[in-house]
Amino acid sequence: MAVPKKKTSKAKRNQRSATWKGKAAVAAQRAMSIGKSVLSGRAQGFVYPVREADDEES
């Protein structure tokens, strides 16, 4: 069974954690930005389905 030979230092662990959290923060910011643009009607970079009104169905 594969096991690490030496214990990972706290500095290395913290550095990896900070990188991971930074990437997560960037992804969250992009998601919020896209969500805001969709809700405000300014989204132009992608296509998304729009619910049709009930009047058109009858």
Swiss-Prot record:
Signal peptide from the UniProt entry: none
Ribosomal protein in keyword set: yes
Entry annotated with the keyword Ribosomal protein: yes
Family matches, as SUPFAM superfamilies: Zn-binding ribosomal proteins
One GO term describing the cellular component: large ribosomal subunit
Sequence ranges of Basic residues compositional bias: 1-15
UniProt-listed GO biological process terms: translation
Keywords (A to Z) from UniProt: Ribonucleoprotein, Ribosomal protein
Record region (Disordered): 1-23
Highest taxon listed in the record's lineage: Bacteria
One Pfam family hit: Ribosomal_L32p
InterPro entries to which the protein is assigned, alphabetical: Ribosomal_bL32 (IPR002677), Ribosomal_bL32_plant/cyanobact (IPR044958), Ribosomal_zn-bd (IPR011332)
Gene Ontology molecular function, alphabetical: structural constituent of ribosome
Family: Belongs to the bacterial ribosomal protein bL32 family.
Protein name in the entry: Large ribosomal subunit protein bL32
